UniProtKB/Swiss-Prot annotation:
EC number: 2.1.1.172
Family membership: Belongs to the methyltransferase superfamily. RsmC family.
Catalytic activity as recorded in UniProt: guanosine(1207) in 16S rRNA + S-adenosyl-L-methionine = N(2)-methylguanosine(1207) in 16S rRNA + S-adenosyl-L-homocysteine + H(+)
Protein name: Ribosomal RNA small subunit methyltransferase C
Record GO terms (molecular function): 16S rRNA (guanine(1207)-N(2))-methyltransferase activity; nucleic acid binding
PANTHER family, per database record: RIBOSOMAL RNA SMALL SUBUNIT METHYLTRANSFERASE C
SUPFAM superfamilies for the chain: S-adenosyl-L-methionine-dependent methyltransferases (SSF53335)
Entry-linked Pfam families: MTS, MTS_N
């Protein structure tokens, strides 16, 4: 996080307006403007662990990571700067949460790329903080209003649920494949062999569907799940509980919080971070897997067929196999051998 996003560049056009403000930054925090903008005081709340890692190094305890913000997270703030995400239900969850905590009279700024649908903020907040567009640049919109009425926020009302082959999947706004199992994950699941044993790590676990489906036909596996997303971590915990499957679930930026080695690492890695295309997580996953696989252990991932992962797999493991494919997706397998680079 060094270069500013277009949304932050729009905010910087108004930097003089923020010098006396006590600001809470929230939403899709893709850079470190919250730590660098000249203000009377700054706090940040994010649901993304990797964004919190960067901000906490500069802001300390004034940067918070959690699914739901608390009164302590917004204490003494008189201004909210909210970065609109690409997912409207995610924005609604976060904004209703934050506006239920901030005092009436709080200045509300909403900024985001036009392609993210930021203009829908006006309708979403009409009953609580009527917004007006105050700037348009860098293909972004900046909206301003003042909090007139606090909404009632109930996190439980945002939970969703669907079934896959008799399994219950719990979801929240912002979780990948919130409304159903995606095609890539279906392809990966089709390759998992029944009666597998050993320690399995699910990186970027989303709602936990890969893990519970795997555990159903391989009940002796020992599961560990991780994701950068607080909604995903909570959804996976709920999915495991709903299907009576045991496993450890925690927030991690790929392997940042992962300890030990595993017999298999599975993943449907993301290639977007907010609105931006990013292959960093998947490349970190592939290169870091050798430090977390036992000898003979296996990395198995599914990815869009056009993404350039074969070269990274070969560079890291010495070889790879494509064990399933469709027109759009491929499932890759790489085995931990003496050929593999040890990181």
């Amino acid at each position: 996080m060094s270069a500013f996003t277009p949304a932050s560049e729009v905010l910087l056009r108004h930097s003089d307006d923020f010098e006396q403000s006590r600001i809470l930054f929230a939403g899709d925090l893709q850079d470190d403007l919250p730590a660098r903008l000249d203000t009377a005081a700054s706090r940040a709340h994010t649901q993304q662990f990797h964004h919190w890692q960067v901000l906490s190094r500069q802001m300390g305890d004034n940067a918070r990571f959690s699914l739901v913000a608390t009164a302590d997270d917004v204490a003494d703030c008189d201004t909210l700067i909210y970065y609109w995400p690409k997912n409207k239900p995610e924005a609604q969850f976060q904004l209703m949460n934050l506006l239920s905590l901030l005092p009436v009279g709080t200045d509300i700024f909403v900024v985001g790329e036009n392609r993210s649908g930021v203009r829908s903020a006006e309708q979403m907040l009409a009953d609580y903080a009527p917004l007006n567009k105050v700037d348009s640049a860098r293909r972004c919109g900046l909206y301003f209003g003042r909090l007139e009425k606090q909404p009632v926020f109930d996190a439980d009302k945002f939970w969703g649920e669907y079934s896959v082959d008799g399994l219950t999947v719990k979801t929240l706004p912002g979780v990948f494949s919130r409304d159903g199992l995606d095609v890539g994950s279906q392809l990966l699941l089709s390759t998992l062999t029944p009666h597998t044993k050993g320690k399995v790590l699910d990186v970027g676990c989303g709602a936990g569907v890969l893990s519970v489906a795997f555990a159903r036909h391989s009940p002796k596996i020992r599961l560990t799940l991780c994701d950068v997303s607080a909604p995903a971590v909570e959804a996976s915990r709920a999915t495991l509980a709903a299907n009576c499957v045991e496993g450890e679930v925690f927030a991690s930026n790929v392997f940042s919080e992962v300890k030990g080695r595993f017999d298999m690492i599975i993943s449907n890695p993301p290639f977007h971070d907010g609105m931006q295309t990013s292959l960093d997580a998947a490349q970190t996953l592939i290169r870091g897997a050798v430090r977390h696989l036992n000898s003979g252990g296996e990395l198995r991932i599914v990815a869009n067929a056009f993404l350039p992962y074969p070269d990274v797999l070969d560079e890291t493991f010495g070889f790879h196999e494509v064990i399933a494919q469709t027109g759009r997706f491929k499932v890759y397998r790489a085995i931990m051998t003496r050929q593999a680079k040890k990181g």
